[in-house]
Amino acid sequence: MAEAHQAVAFQFTVTPEGVDFRLSREALKHIYLSGINSWKKRLIRIKNGILRGVYPGSPTSWLVVASATAGSSYYNVDISMGLVNHIQRCLPERYGPYWTPQTRALLSMAVVSTGVWMIGIFFFRQTLKLLLSYHGWMFEMHGQSSRVTKVWAICVRLLSSRRPMLYSFQTSLPKLPVPSVPATIHRYLESVQHLLDDEEYSRKEMLAKEFQEKTAPRLQKYLVLKSWWATNYVSDWWEEYVYLRGRTPLMVNSNYYVMDLVLMRSTDVQAARLGNAVHAMIMYRRKLDREDIKPVMALGIVPMCSYQMERMFNTTRIPGKDTDTLQHLTDSRHVAVYHKGRFFKVWLYEGSRLLKPCELELQFQRILDDPSPPQPGEEKLAALTAGGRVEWAQARQAFFSSGKNKFALDAIERAAFFVALDEESHHYDPEDEASLSLYGKALLHGNCYNRWFDKSFTLIAFKNGQLGLNTEHAWADAPIIGHLWEFVLGTDTFHLGYTETGHCLGKPNPMLAPPQRLQWDIPEQCQAVIESSYQVAKALADDVELYCFQFLPFGKGLIKKCRTSPDAFVQIALQLAYFRDRGKFCLTYEASMTRMFREGRTETVRSCTRESTAFVQAMVEGRRVKADLQDLFRKAAQKHQNMYRLAMTGAGIDRHLFCLYVVSKYLGVSSPFLAEVLSEPWRLSTSQIAQFQIRMFDPNKYPNHLGAGGGFGPVADDGYGVSYMIAGENTIFFHVSSKFSSSETNAQRFGNHIRQALLDLADLFQVPKTDS
C-alpha cells in the first residue's frame, strides 16, 4: 500500500547544512489539476445559476426580445413607447471615440429589451408558481379530469416546455401552506376517536378545545410569520429536532438500508462489481453537479423539489454533545474504504480524469489482496458511529482533533462516500426464505463496525458481488437515494457491463498509485470507548428481528382489477394483519412526501382510520356478505387515498402540530395537549418504497431487473416497522422489523399475517391469482 507521505506535496528535513526541501512532482501535479477542476466547477455553477435564474426564460428568448426591439426601431415603430429614446437622452453624449449615437441607441435598446425580458420572466415564473399551487387534479378520479384541470395542465406544459435543469423549478415551487388550527385539531381528533374509549376521548377532546381556544392562536401567529420568511416552515426544524438532536445510536434507530437487484447478478467478482458501481455513482455526481438530471415530475408535468439531492455526496454527519451537524463539501476526489479492519483512501481521479471501472476494480482488488493486519484499535473504530452520539462526540474531541488521527478521520469524513468490502456473501435464494432477511440484517447493521454510519451513505460490496446501501437519514429521505440507486443499477447492467469472466471492460493503467492506507494512533483509553460503543451497538443489533419476504401470488396488476389504489390496498391489509396479530388497533404512521412544495420532505398519513377499522372488524367477525365487505373496503380505501392526498398537499396533521410544539418551547409555553400528542407511540410505522423514478429500461422486457427495496428498524420497542415495494405487476417485497426483547411482537408472525391478509382481500374480490 502507498505510504502516507505520497499524499504530501513537499517534505523537509533539518540537516547540519540547513533545511532540505524535497518536492513531490506528482503531488504538485495533483494539486494543480485539482485547482483547475475546482475552477471548472465554479464556472459551471455560475453558468447553471444564470440559466436556472432566468427559467422559464432562456438566452434565446432574450435575443428574440432584443431583435424585436431593434427591428421595430429599424421600421420606425416605437414599441417601447418612448422608453428607448428616454434612456438614450439620459446617456452622456461623449464618452470616448466609439461612443456614437448608434452605440447609445443600441445600448438603450439592450437595456429596454433586458428589462422587458426580465419582467416577462418574473410574470411567467409567478404564473407558474400560481399554477403549481393548484392541487385539484389530485382529488379527481383517474381518467376523469375536469375541464379546469385540463386547461391547467395545458398552461403548465406551455410554461415549462423548455428542457429544465435539475433545479430550474425551485423558485417556481409554492411554499408549504400552514393549515388552520381548527382544521388540524378536527382531523387529529377524527384520527384517534376510534382508538380510544368514550372517557379517554372526552378527555382528549377537552384538552384539544382548551389548546385551540387559549394557546394555539398565539403559537399559530408565530408559525405563520415564520412561513412568510422561511422557505419551508417545517423542514429546518424537522431536520434539527427529529434527526440531528437525537442522542440515540443512528444504527437501526435512524439509518435505513437499500437492497441490490435480487433476481439477477451480472458478476460474482467483488472488485469488478464495486468498480462499476463506484464509477456509475461518480457519473451521477457529475450530472448532479452540472444539474444535468431531469427533475422528478408527477403526471409528467408537476415538478418535485430537488433540494435534498444537493447533499447526496461529500456529506458527513458530525457528532456533537447536544446536537449533530451536517458537513457538506462542494467536492471530494476520493472514497474511504473499509476491509478486514483496515481503512484505505482510494483516489477516484488520475489528474482530472475519472478512473475507468477497470481501474477502480484494480484498486479495490489491491485492497482485497493486501495482507497487512489492522493497527491497534482500528478494527472496531467505526463502532463509534454506531453507538451513542454523546460518547462519540466526546471521543472525537479527545482523540481525533489533532495529529495523524485527525488526518485519517478527515480522509473518511471528507470522502465522497464510504465503501465497505465485506468478507461475507449474501444473496436472495427463493428456495431459502431466510436468505433475504439475512441479507437485510447485514445491510441494516453489519457487524456494527464495518459501516461508517455517519456518512451520507455507505456502499456495501459482499464477497459474491452483491451490493447494498446503508443510508443516513438526516440529509434526505429514501426516494432521493433511490433515484441514485436506480441510475447505478441501470448503468451497471445496460451501459458499463462486464467481460465473459466477470471483470470490468477495458484495460487499466498498471502504473496507478495504489490505495493509501490510513494511519492511526489510538490510545488504550480510546480503545475502551470504542469497545463500549461496540457493546451498545451489538446489543441493539442483536435485538432486531428482521423478516423480509417476496409476496408472489400477485402485485399491482391484480390490485388494479379491484379498482383501488395499490397503496391503499396494502395499507388496509396491514391493518387487518395487525388486528389479527395483536387483537387491537394502533396509531399507524405512513410516510408521505410534500415535495410538491419548496424544500418539502415528508408528512404523516394516519392510515388507521375509522373506515379501515370498521372493515377489519367486519372481516374478522365474518358475518357480512361479500357485497357489504366490498363496500366497507372501498370506503376505507377512498378515505385512505383522501388522507394521503391531503398530506401531500400540505393539509396533514402531524407536521403542523410538531411545529406548534417547537414554537411553544421557544416561547416557554406549556401545552399538555401538544406534549401528549407528540409522545403517542407509533406501534406500526410503514413506508412504501418509490421505484422507476428513472426510465432507463423497459421493466416488461427485463422483468428480472428488479430490486427488493429496503427497510428500517422498528420505531417503538413494542411495535413493527414495515416497508414494502410494489415491484411491478406481479410481486410485492416486504421488510418487517421488530425487537426480540418485546414479548408482544414477532416479525415473522406478522409477516405471515400480512401474506394471509393480502390473499383474503384478493378473495374478497374473487380475482384469480397465482399460487403462493
Curated annotation (Swiss-Prot):
- Pathway, per record: Lipid metabolism; fatty acid beta-oxidation
**Location in or out of the cell:** Mitochondrion outer membrane
Membrane topology is: Multi-pass membrane protein
Membrane-spanning ranges: 48-73, 103-122
Give residue spans on the Cytoplasmic membrane side.
1-47, 123-772
Mitochondrial intermembrane compartment residues: 74-102
Q: Which UniProt keywords apply?
A: Acyltransferase, Fatty acid metabolism, Lipid metabolism, Membrane, Mitochondrion, Mitochondrion outer membrane, Transferase, Transmembrane, Transmembrane helix, Transport
Entry binding sites for CoA: 555-567
The Gene Ontology CC terms held by the record are: mitochondrial outer membrane; mitochondrion
GO MF annotations for this entry? carnitine O-palmitoyltransferase activity
Q: Say yes or no: keyword tRNA processing present.
A: no
- Please indicate if the UniProt record lists Cell cycle as a keyword: no
The EC number(s) attached to this protein equal 2.3.1.21
Q: What catalytic reaction does the record list?
A: (R)-carnitine + hexadecanoyl-CoA = O-hexadecanoyl-(R)-carnitine + CoA
Listed GO biological process terms: carnitine metabolic process; fatty acid beta-oxidation; fatty acid metabolic process; long-chain fatty acid transport; response to blue light
Q: Can you tell which superkingdom this protein's organism belongs to?
A: Eukaryota
Active site, UniProt feature: 473
Kindly list the positions annotated as binding (R)-carnitine.
589, 602
Q: What does this protein do?
A: Catalyzes the transfer of the acyl group of long-chain fatty acid-CoA conjugates onto carnitine, an essential step for the mitochondrial uptake of long-chain fatty acids and their subsequent beta-oxidation in the mitochondrion.
Q: Which family does it belong to?
A: Belongs to the carnitine/choline acetyltransferase family.
PANTHER family registered for this protein in UniProt: CARNITINE O-ACYLTRANSFERASE, CARNITINE O-PALMITOYLTRANSFERASE 1, MUSCLE ISOFORM
What protein name does the entry list? Carnitine O-palmitoyltransferase 1, muscle isoform
Q: Which organism is it from?
A: Sus scrofa
Q: Which gene encodes it?
A: CPT1B
